[in-house]
Amino acid sequence: MNIAGLVCYRPGDRSRLIYRIRAWRGRKGESKALTWTDYRDLLVAAHQQLGGPIVLVWDNLSVHKMPPMQEFIDEHADWLTVFHFPTYSPELNPAEGIWSMLKASLTNFAATNMDHLVRTTKRQLKMIQYRASLVDGCLTQTGLIMEPS
């Protein structure tokens, strides 16, 4: 199972977590990892949900820097601006706080199958998603500060 997530902050608004899960089931031709199109679709969904331009600060995952992804970013420069975190700096990424909370919530969990794992993971992420103070804390722990433009 792979998860991609965006932790969204805007001064004066409730913090948001937007995510997608890919459960690998071993089907012929099925990708085990999230592809650049999965990330593209996540960005499009975020743009629709948030209803405004996005300034994205991304880690240096190779799929984030693939030529088709870069083309998508360039084509949507009217609503999408992308910066990258410095290399090897997970401590600056608020999403890492989300993954840490998720992992802690699943510490003693033993899934019976992939569907059970996906359902439980979604339930745990929804619990985080609906508690904006938890999402806010992920930004606070990075030491980064939001400044209104």
Label the model's feature ranges.
Residues M1-S149:
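Short functional hotspots at interaction and active-site rims
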